[in-house]
Structure formats: C-alpha cells, structure tokens
C-alpha cells in the first residue's frame, strides 16, 4: 500500500527524529528496534502533526542518502544538529552577554516604560527583514517544525549625528534562537546612514511558544557630558511559535478584556418578593435555639478598601490600626471569638464582591415549559451545574426589568429558587410581575449566596465561650481517665487492618479515651487509609461502649456519604444520614437512601423529631447540617464522641459547628467529650477568597493549628506522642516512584509503599513511557498563557493539545468494538486554572474525533486540584498552564497555580496510583524549589521528554532575571500590562479571579 507521505515529508520527519535523539542524548543509539520504540512511544507525541510510520521514515532517509539502514541497525549520517540551532562559535553571540553585571540596573531603568523602548531615538531605529508579524510591540515568527527561519534586525542610524552602540543583549533562555553579528565588535560607532545587523536564526523540533528579547544600549550624539549625550535603549521582543493543529483550534475566541465590577447589586427601596418553596411537611425537628443574622458591621465594610491597601499598623488611622492589631495578634483563647468573627466578616465581604462576577445583563426569562407551573419562570444560568454560582432550592436572587434599570426608583423583584435543572433555574416572583410577564422579557439579574453556613459558624463561636471549650481547643494536658483498660482486645470488622500497627494504635487510643479533653488526631498522608481507620474506630466505639452516641461529620456531602456507605456495612440499623433539604436527591448514592431522611413515597425530605434522632447510635451529617442539631438543642451530653473526617479541609469555625453546643468537656470518667479529627495538614486546607483572611489565619483548620502550635502534638525525638496523635505511614495507593518526591518533601521519608503490586505496576511497561519501569512522565512544553473574553483565568493551548495526545494513547480502542483499553473512569486530568479545565474538556468532547466517540468519555473527570482532593485515579495527567513569564509575580503573590503552593503540588501528584503524566514549562517551574526537585528526579530517572531540559542555573539569579524580563515582555494584555497587577489586586483575592473555585453548597 503506497505511503500517504511524500518523500520530502518522510525525510523531514527523519531529520526531526534525528534532532530529537540529539536533545535526548540518544544520538549514538543504533539498534533498530530500540529506535523504533523511541519513535513510536515518545517522538510521535511531540511531533505536532501526523507522523509517518517508523519503517516509512527510514525508507525516506535511506533514499535521500541520510541514513544507513540494515535489518538490525540504523545509523543516521551526521546532520546540522538543529535541536540547539548551532552556529560557528566565532559568529554566535552568547545569550545575555554581560547581563550578570548589568541586568539589575538595566531592568530597573525600563521597568515602568516598556513602550518607550519600542520607539527609535535620535533618528536611530530597528528595521526588521524576514518573515514575521508585528503584534503589540512583539515580532511573531511562525515556524514549521524542523524548518529554519531567519530574521535580520538592522539597527540603522537615520539621524544626522553619530551614535555609539555600546552593548547588545540578546536575552533568551531557550535554544530555539541563535544570534550572530558578522564579527562586528562592540562598542561600534554608527555614523549617519550606517547600520549594525543582528541575524536571528529560529528553529525548533517541538511545538510551543519561545520568547526572547533583544536590547540595544547606545550612547547618544555629542561628546560625553555635552547636551544630547547619554545612554539610551531600544528593545525588540521576539516570539517564535510552532503550533500543533489542535492547539491552533484553541486560540482565544475573543480578545481578553478585563471587566470591572461596579459594586453592590441594585436593590431599590421597592422590593417585591415571590413565594418561598414549601417547607417539608415532615419537618418535625425542633427549632429551639434562634439563629442570628450576624451581618458584617457597616463600618467594617467602609474601612475594607483601606485594609486592603496594606498600610502599616504604625501609620494607619486609629480604626484601621485597631483592626490590623486584631488580625495580627496570634490566636489565643482570650481573642478567639473576636478574631475568628472578624475573619468571617472579611471573608463574607469578599464573597459579596466575587458573586458579582456572575451577574447577568439583559437576559430573558420564560414561563416554566416542563411543569406547566403558571407561577414559575425559568432562567438560564451558565455554570450553575458546577456551582459557579451556587444556586440551590430556597435561595433567592434579585431581578430588575431591563427597561426600568435607568428609572429613578424601579421595582426590584426578589425571586425564590424552587427547582434547579441542569443550567436552568425555576423561580417564583410576585404576582405583580407575573401578571405583566410575557416570554422573552429581559432582566438584569443579581445573584446572592446562601448565608446559612456563615451564620451557623458565627453562632458556634458564641457557644464556644458559653460552654468553655478551651480545654478542647487549646489543650494542655489530658485528664487521663480511661474509659476502658489500655489492653482491651479489639476484634476488628475489617481484618485487613490487623497488620497495620499505626491504625491499630489510633483505634485503641480512641476507644479507651485517654486523650480527653484534648482531641485525638489521625494524621493521614495520601493513600494511608485515614477514613478506613476512622470508620473502624467508630464501629469499635459502638461495640465496646454501649452508652456511646456518635456524631460523624465531614465538610462535604461526598465525604459524609462515604462515611455512611462504609458504616452501614456492619451497622445498618444503628446509623442515620441527615441530608439538607437543598441536596439534589439525584446526587445521593443509592446505597445510602435507605438510611437517610429521604421519604421515597412522599418524594421529599423529612426531619424526624429530636427524640427519634437520639435513638440512633451514629448520626452522619455535613458540618454545616450539624447546626440543625444545635438549633434543636440536643442535650449537651448526648453525643459522647464526635468524629470529623477531612478535618484539614475546613475552616476552624466550620469545625466548631459540630462541636459547640453539642459536646461538653468531661471532668470525670463518664463516657463523653471525645473529639477525633482525621486529616492531613500537608494537603489543601479550606478554600478562601479574601487575601486578608488567607494572610491572617482563617486558612488554618483546627487540625493544622493544633499540629503546628500545640506542644501536645509536636513531634519529639521518638516521634509523635501516640496518646494524642497517630501518623499513618503505609500508603495503599501509589507506585513507590510516584510517592518518592512528596514523601521526601512533606512526610520526612516515612511513608511506605504498600499498594497492590499488580495495580501499581500496571503501566510500568506501557509503550508511552520514556523509560520502562519508571511510571512518571514530565513532558516539557514551552507554551503560552492565553486569556479570552472577560475571564481572567489562564489557559495554554499547547499543553491542552499535549494532554489530549496522551489521552488518545491511553484510551485507544483495543478492539473493533470500540471498547477502550483503559476506562475513562480510571483517568483524571488536573489543572489549577478554570479556563484550562474548560479547554481540555472541549478537546475531549468536541474537537478530537477519537475521544468524543468513546461511549463513556463523560466519565473522564477534568477538574481543579481542589476537586480531586480525597480522590484517586489509576492515571493522573496534570497541566500546569503557566508558561509566559509576564505573569509569574502574580502567581507568587497569590499562591496561584502550583508555584509557591506546596499543598497544591502535593495533592496533585499524589492522586495517581500507577501512572503520573505532567505537562508544563520546565524553565518556569524550575524556579520553585519543590518543582525543581521533582524535575531533576524525572530527568535523572529518564522520565523527562519534550522540549530540551534547561541547564542547571542559579535559582535566585535566574528568578531575578526571569522576573525582570517579565516586565519587558509583552503579555496577552498588551504593551502596558505592568499596570495590570495593582489594578487586579484591588478588592479581590487572586484565587477567586484565576481558579474560580466552586461556591459552597454543602448545607
């Protein structure tokens, strides 16, 4: 069958492969079968366009006399090795020559006025000759793979007086550029009409975006010291771009335009309310304790802009200084309620601001088309299925008729949510609006968020003081009054735990209760079975302490559901899962419906009376729903044990909701007063929006605060004190190689790889591995950060295309029936940026024909690091996104993406069981210490592929230069993007801008 590739295409593919071997250090390899393996498993992914078969490529090289080929050996004739675009050293300029001596003062001079350096001075300017596009002050050079392009930058003196070129700085950290200057020495006088030429050669074997900057330093006309003399600079910003076909389809749809939020929603003096949803008829749970509103003080709202300015406590006005003093004082019992309440108020003010991102202008509503309810209107809300924004039954929003928004005092219509179906929300409005409504009438819509979680946290802070819980929150010593003998024999329900000494130790201390009133902590690193340990401990308490009653909680519905699923196996009649009425019953796992408060016959939630709920040995709720038990005023001594799973993932006031008012400190040997926290302080904590609350401690969970600051939980010479804390050490998830770096960085090398050998080594012989037996791939991509429309979140087309290529290899059908070799359910894709998540989903479900044709492709989860916490997959792919250097400092300031956020890095890389693939820019990531260790680990063990690995460079000097160059390079925002940082900081946290976290709906 004739090849579909021409001889020229076969030859070019072979030359590109030969260059690829040079970059990888494999140019001496001659074994034909080994070369075939490298070509098929590794080279084709980074080729960017469809590549010919290995044998066809060899044929093309052979007939072109570029290779010697036998049945067992292949020898490529020596070529001009373009992987590094090499030139004769006598002509080639050193990149950034003399920059180490001058770069600090040089970069400082042009920090604020980059645009000025694009224009000629004293008649001197730069002429460009060669293929390029000029865009926003940047010279864009489009490359075909393995094909050289040459650009000549001609510095011409078009003035009437002589000038002197004193220095020339080609600033570039990538080998795709080479600069040479025809042996013209510097300094070089340039008389009127004279030129100085710099030749720029560009070539790449890899798709990507490769930036460079050229800076000319000149001495102006006139004698030194005379009028007109002086140093001036001219700059040109270059970018070589080689796109894969898929990446070309992912370019920004519309230019990025930053939106401004105009303030609070328009709520006028005239408000008309719709009808609230009917309360469940089976709501028998008492409401004995009132719940306050706890609105932020108006004065705090007024002072917030000044607080965000970061004024020193010593120079700030008195009110600001007092608030800052409260924020900067360490958390103690004496300031516990005051400081945490202030932080909650600040977080709420940020939420009020962030929710405005979702407001809609001139959107139509229609009559409810499905239920034929004449009193409900339907509104399309993009993103509501992903809780962006969160809209639940019982919530409300405000709507103004578009035609009335400019009136002096229009009517604001308050609509209550009755039903949510995919991206459609069904709302009840007042009869006066319904009487004049016609399909297609347009509105301005302002969203709100549910304040219930904040209100119950404020109440919990009040109750903490009322019930004097300081011995539990700031423990100093145990009462040492055991409930059972320390040698009590535990017959485990899960017999597999008997071989794990750490899990046995934790369960024994929890059951005997020797730690009270101090909480007992199960420190569970990734994959060590903390939830399994906690569940078995609950079962043992039920078994050995007949009078015990347990409240088991988690911050999320999924976490609470998991507790219920595992407890019901052995305690089916003793447990009850209490769900919030806003929970979509379709999202509730089928196996827990028999033991939860859903009445299938009535088709609604029920809430049994307090007396009925007290009959169950174990109640399971989210932390926020536990507030309903406080409102019902359960007896303070009813719950003897409170277990909180995922305790490191919630704010401290959120943990208090399940404690304050439901548990008291026990002074005697009576059962009770035992709090158990399970989590990992090295993984992600609570998701916060306000930069102030992040800075001043609201991001600390109760678990992390105790581990960090309380002496009872400190690690001593002999390890942790098992009376208070157990660190689980056996990892049952990951291949030892995947576990290696996070184990060394975050867990003192103590974790032991105990995963099933067959499961963890499933991909050790996968053809796509750069090195067999090493199931980690770091695929280097020099991509480009992009943004589009009014979304501030970043995406990287080249990385998205590379991830898609790997998915095609992993999910390729293994038979003609179309059955995937690997189930999409076993694969997860992680990216820290919301827009990149959207682009990768678009590739999978729309652009790529092979992937979108898989029946179960919808089961492949693509999400943020936060969305994957607590989960695992056989294969994890990570797209780090950040590549253009112009936004590095934004990441450093706000802990965005992976840079400078060890917890996010730790969670991302520890989700994988058998194969971890990371796609990112090694040059950028190498400036973070943790990523640098990981990159070198991959390189040393043969797991690195993609663009050439950067040479080792001094970390601090490299970072200084990188950040300095970021101020020179044009960004996607245009030539004045250095103005972007202070503007975008104003009033909002970087996390909510870039990552766009889900709005909490765990009620």
UniProtKB/Swiss-Prot annotation:
Residues 966-1003 are annotated as: Disordered. Changing residue 645 to N: Abolishes 5' to 3' directional unwinding activity. It comes from the Eukaryota. The modification N6-acetyllysine is found at residue 148. One of its GO terms (molecular function) is ATP hydrolysis activity. The modification Phosphothreonine is found at residues 160, 254. A motif (DEAG box) lies at residues 645-648. GO terms for biological process: 3'-UTR-mediated mRNA destabilization; defense response to virus; miRNA-mediated gene silencing by mRNA destabilization; miRNA-mediated post-transcriptional gene silencing; positive regulation of mRNA catabolic process; regulation of neuron projection arborization; regulatory ncRNA-mediated post-transcriptional gene silencing; transposable element silencing. Residues 921-965 are annotated as: Interaction with AGO2 and APOBEC3G. ATP binds at residues 524-531. Keywords: Acetylation, ATP-binding, Cytoplasm, Helicase, Host-virus interaction, Hydrolase, Nucleotide-binding, Nucleus, Phosphoprotein, RNA-binding, RNA-mediated gene silencing, Transcription, Transcription regulation, Ubl conjugation. It is an enzyme of class 3 (hydrolase). Its main location: cytoplasm. SUPFAM superfamilies: P-loop containing nucleoside triphosphate hydrolases (SSF52540). Induction: By herpes simplex 1/HHV-1 virus infection. InterPro entries: DNA2/NAM7-like_C, DNA2/NAM7_AAA_11, MOV-10-like_beta-barrel, MOV-10/SDE3_DEXXQ/H-box, Mov-10_helical, MOV-10_Ig-like, MOV-10_N, P-loop_NTPase. Ubiquitinated by the DCX(DCAF12) complex that specifically recognizes the glutamate-leucine (Glu-Leu) degron at the C-terminus, leading to its degradation. GO terms for cellular component: cytoplasmic ribonucleoprotein granule; cytoplasmic stress granule; cytosol; extracellular space; nucleus; P granule; P-body. The modification Phosphoserine is found at residues 432, 969, 977. It catalyses: ATP + H2O = ADP + phosphate + H(+). Residues 976-988 have a biased composition (Basic and acidic residues). 5' to 3' RNA helicase that is involved in a number of cellular roles ranging from mRNA metabolism and translation, modulation of viral infectivity, inhibition of retrotransposition, or regulation of synaptic transmission. Plays an important role in innate antiviral immunity by promoting type I interferon production. Mechanistically, specifically uses IKKepsilon/IKBKE as the mediator kinase for IRF3 activation. Blocks HIV-1 virus replication at a post-entry step. (Microbial infection) Required for RNA-directed transcription and replication of the human hepatitis delta virus (HDV). Interacts with small capped HDV RNAs derived from genomic hairpin structures that mark the initiation sites of RNA-dependent HDV RNA transcription. Belongs to the DNA2/NAM7 helicase family. SDE3 subfamily. PANTHER family: CANCER/TESTIS ANTIGEN 55 (PTHR45418), CANCER_TESTIS ANTIGEN 55 (PTHR45418:SF1). Interacts with DICER1, AGO2, TARBP2, EIF6 and RPL7A (60S ribosome subunit); they form a large RNA-induced silencing complex (RISC). Interacts with APOBEC3G in an RNA-dependent manner. Interacts with TRIM71 (via NHL repeats) in an RNA-dependent manner. Interacts with both protein products of LIRE1, ORF1p and ORF2p. Interacts with TUT4 and, to a lesser extent, TUT7; the interactions are RNA-dependent. Interacts with AGO2, TNRC6B and UPF1; the interactions are direct and RNA-dependent. (Microbial infection) Interacts with the human hepatitis delta virus (HDV) antigen HDAg. This is Helicase MOV-10.
């Amino acid at each position: 069958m004739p090849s579909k590739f021409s001889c020229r295409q076969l030859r070019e593919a072979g030359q590109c492969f030969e260059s690829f071997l040079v970059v990888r250090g494999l140019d001496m390899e001659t074994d034909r079968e080994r070369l075939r393996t490298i070509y098929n498993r590794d080279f084709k992914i980074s080729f960017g366009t469809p590549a010919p078969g290995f044998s066809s490529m060899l044929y093309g090289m052979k007939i072109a006399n570029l290779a010697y080929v036998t049945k067992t050996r292949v020898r490529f004739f020596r070529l001009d090795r373009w992987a590094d675009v090499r030139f004769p050293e006598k002509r080639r300029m050193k990149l950034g020559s003399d920059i180490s001596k001058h770069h600090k003062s040089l970069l400082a001079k042009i920090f604020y006025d980059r645009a000025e350096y694009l224009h000629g001075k004293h008649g001197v300017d730069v002429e460009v000759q060669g293929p390029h596009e000029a865009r926003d002050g940047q010279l864009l050079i489009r490359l075909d793979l393995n094909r050289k392009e040459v650009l000549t930058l001609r510095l011409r003196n078009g003035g009437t007086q002589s000038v002197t070129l004193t220095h020339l700085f080609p600033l570039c950290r990538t080998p795709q550029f080479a600069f040479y200057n025809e042996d013209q020495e510097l300094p070089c006088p340039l008389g009127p009409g004279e030129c100085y030429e710099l030749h720029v050669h560009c070539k790449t074997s890899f798709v990507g975006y490769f930036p460079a900057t050229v800076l000319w330093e000149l001495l102006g006309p006139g004698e030194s010291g005379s009028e007109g003399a002086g140093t001036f600079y001219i700059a040109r910003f270059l970018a070589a771009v080689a796109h894969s076909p898929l990446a070309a389809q992912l370019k920004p749809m519309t230019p990025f335009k930053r939106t401004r939020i105009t303030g609070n929603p328009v709520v006028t003096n005239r408000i008309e309310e719709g009808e609230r949803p009917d309360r469940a008829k089976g709501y028998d749970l008492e409401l004995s304790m009132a719940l306050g509103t706890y609105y932020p003080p108006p004065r705090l709202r007024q002072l917030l802009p000044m607080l965000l300015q970061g004024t020193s406590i010593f120079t700030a006005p008195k009110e600001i200084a007092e608030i800052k003093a409260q924020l900067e004082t360490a958390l103690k019992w004496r300031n516990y309620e005051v400081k945490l309440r202030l932080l909650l108020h600040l977080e709420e003010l940020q939420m009020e601001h962030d929710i405005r991102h979702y407001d809609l202008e001139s959107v139509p509503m229609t009559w409810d088309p499905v239920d034929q309810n004449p009193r409900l209107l339907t509104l399309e809300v993009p993103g509501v299925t992903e809780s962006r924004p969160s809209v639940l039954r019982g919530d409300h929003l405000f709507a103004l008729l578009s035609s009335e928004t400019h009136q002096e005092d229009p009517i604001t219509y308050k609509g209550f949510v009755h039903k949510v179906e995919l991206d459609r929300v069904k709302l009840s409005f007042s009869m006066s609006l319904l009487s004049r409504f016609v399909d297609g009438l347009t509105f301005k819509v302002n969203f709100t968020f549910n304040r219930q979680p904040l209100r119950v946290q404020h109440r919990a802070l009040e109750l903490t003081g009322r019930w004097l819980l300081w011995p539990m929150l700031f423990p100093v010593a145990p009462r040492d009054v055991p409930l059972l003998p320390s040698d009590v024999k535990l017959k485990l329900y899960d017999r597999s735990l008997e071989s794990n000494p750490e899990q046995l130790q934790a369960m024994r201390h929890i059951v005997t209760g020797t730690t009270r009133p101090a909480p007992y902590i199960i420190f569970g690193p990734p994959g060590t079975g903390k939830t399994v340990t906690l569940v078995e401990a609950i079962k043992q308490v039920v078994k050995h302490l007949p009078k015990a009653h347990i409240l088991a909680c988690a911050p999320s519905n999924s976490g609470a559901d998991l507790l219920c699923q595992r407890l019901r196996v052995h305690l089916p009649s003793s447990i009850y899962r209490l769900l919030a009425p806003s929970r979509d019953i379709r999202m509730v796992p089928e196996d827990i419906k028999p033991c939860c408060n859903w009445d299938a016959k009535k088709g609604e939630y029920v809430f049994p009376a307090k007396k009925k709920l007290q009959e169950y040995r174990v109640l399971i709720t989210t932390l926020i729903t536990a507030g309903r038990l406080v409102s019902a005023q359960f007896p303070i001594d009813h719950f003897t044990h409170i277990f909180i799973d995922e305790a490191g993932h919630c704010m401290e006031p959120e943990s208090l909701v399940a404690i304050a008012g439901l548990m008291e400190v026990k002074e005697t040997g009576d059962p009770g007063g035992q709090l158990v926290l399970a989590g990992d302080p090295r993984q992600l904590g609570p998701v916060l929006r306000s930069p102030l609350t992040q800075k001043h401690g609201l991001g600390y969970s109760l678990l992390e605060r105790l581990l960090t600051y309380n002496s009872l939980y400190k690690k001593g010479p002999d390890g942790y004190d098992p009376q208070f804390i157990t660190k689980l050490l056996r990892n049952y998830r990951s291949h030892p190689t995947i576990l290696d770096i996070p184990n060394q960085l975050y867990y003192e090398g103590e974790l032991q790889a105990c995963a099933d050998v067959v499961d963890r080594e499933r991909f050790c012989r996968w053809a796509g591995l750069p090195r067999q037996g090493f199931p980690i791939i770091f695929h280097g991509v020099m991509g480009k950060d992009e943004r589009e429309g009014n979304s501030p979140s970043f995406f990287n087309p080249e990385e998205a295309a590379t991830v898609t290529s790997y998915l095609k290899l992993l999910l390729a059908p293994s038979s003609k029936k179309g059955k995937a070799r690997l189930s999409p359910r076993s694969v997860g894709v992680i990216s820290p940026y919301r827009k990149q998540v959207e682009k990768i989903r678009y590739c999978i479900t729309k652009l790529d024909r092979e992937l979108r044709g898989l029946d179960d492709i919808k089961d492949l989860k693509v999400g943020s690091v936060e969305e994957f916490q607590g989960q695992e997959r056989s294969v994890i792919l990570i797209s780090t996104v950040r590549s253009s250097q112009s936004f590095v400092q934004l990441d450093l300031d706000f802990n965005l993406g992976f840079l400078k956020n060890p917890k996010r890095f730790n969670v991302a890389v520890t989700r994988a069981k058998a194969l971890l693939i990371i796609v990112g820019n090694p040059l950028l990531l190498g400036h973070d210490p943790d990523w640098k260790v990981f990159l070198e680990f991959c390189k040393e063990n043969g797991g690195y592929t993609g663009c050439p690995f950067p040479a080792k460079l001094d970390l601090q000097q490299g970072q200084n230069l990188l950040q300095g160059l970021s101020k020179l390079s044009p960004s996607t925002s245009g030539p004045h993007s250095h103005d972007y940082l202070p503007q975008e900081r104003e009033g909002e946290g970087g996390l909510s801008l870039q990552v766009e976290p889900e709005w909490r709906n765990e009620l």
